[in-house]
């Protein structure tokens, strides 16, 4: 279950801190502090708009929370609703490093 939670809150519904130097890849400059990398967000107009509104402070439907792998692996999700939270990682490198350094979190038996 922990690996499933990790995948959900990262690869499906993850955000990464925006870097201004990547704006030249866009048609329009990013005006929020985050980039979307989660496929569940990218594939959903409603999820995308929810993040934009929450990031701009025009909605409080969901929380945007700093990445914490220990919290993520213990946090369940509802796949049939707009997410109530999104975790923001500093960089993709930080995500991969945290996974490698915390492999023991996924070997829990019980």
Give the predicted meaning of each segment.
Residues 1-109:
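Core of folded catalytic or high-affinity ligand/protein-binding domains
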């Amino acid at each position: 279950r922990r690996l499933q939670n990790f995948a959900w809150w990262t690869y499906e519904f993850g955000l990464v801190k925006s870097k201004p130097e990547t704006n030249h890849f866009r048609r329009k400059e990013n005006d929020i502090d985050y980039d979307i990398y989660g496929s569940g967000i990218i594939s959903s107009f409603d999820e995308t708009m929810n993040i934009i509104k929450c990031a701009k402070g025009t909605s409080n439907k969901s929380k945007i929370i700093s990445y914490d792998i220990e919290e993520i692996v213990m946090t369940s999700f509802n796949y049939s609703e707009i997410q109530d939270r999104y975790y923001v990682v500093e960089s993709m490198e930080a995500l991969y490093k945290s996974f490698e350094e915390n492999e023991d979190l996924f070997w829990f038996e019980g």
